[in-house]
Amino acid sequence: VNGAGKSTHVGACVDWLRAQGETVVLSREPGGSPLAERLRELLLTEEMQPQTEALLAFAARSDHLHTLIRPALAAGQWVVCDRFTDSTFAYQGGGSDVDTSWLAQLEAHVQDGLQPVRTYLFDLPPEVAAARRAAVRSADRFEARALDYFERVRRAYQARVAADPERFCVLDATATPEQIGRWLQDDLVKVHRRWRERAASPTGAADKAGARPS
């Protein structure tokens, strides 16, 4: 959720990985490619039905994957992405009650099995996130929605964590930025070590086109 401080920590992840000698691509969703950025502008500014939001999000994601993410992974690079598919399940599925089985079908078609190795969820009560956002900028059309919408969004994120706990690392975003940064780096060190060990294994070459953390 915007206001949780994730963008700051995403940059710290990229800096740490580059310090380890990794080539890192930093991206975001919606967006990440020229076409996806144009779709992002529509999503954030134009009123539309929730199903239309979901379709635009997956259209942007499809182009993002084709244009940036898959080529980077195939080249052995890391991709760090500020938001990905979990946000569509949370905002459109949880917040706007779009059928999650339909979203899962779109996910399967667009991603063809590609998933992040690691997903960091910055968990924050909606009222705290709203107060933080109000202190720094005007709201887009999603951020302007009522607190009960963001309660549903938060529950949807929690459901995603429960369904795939090995992929997620949940961080208490009410903590200080310094503490969150320490938690994040401690986990990223482990993720990076596991990846290095896997890449060095006899089967590692076959894994080089796999997903990196998002």
Label each PLM-derived region with a short phrase.
Residues 88-155, 159:
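A glycine- and Lys/Arg-enriched "phosphate-lid" helix/loop adjacent to the NTP-binding pocket
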Residues 27, 80, 118-120, 169-171:
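Hydrophobic/aromatic beta-strand patches that form the interior of the parallel beta-sheet core
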Residues 12-14, 127-214:
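NTP-dependent small-molecule kinase module
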Residues 3-4:
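ATP-binding Walker
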Residues 7:
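Walker A/P-loop
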Residues 30, 60, 84, 124-125, ...:
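Short beta->alpha linker loops
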Residues 22-111, 183, 187:
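ATP-dependent small-molecule kinase phosphotransfer cores
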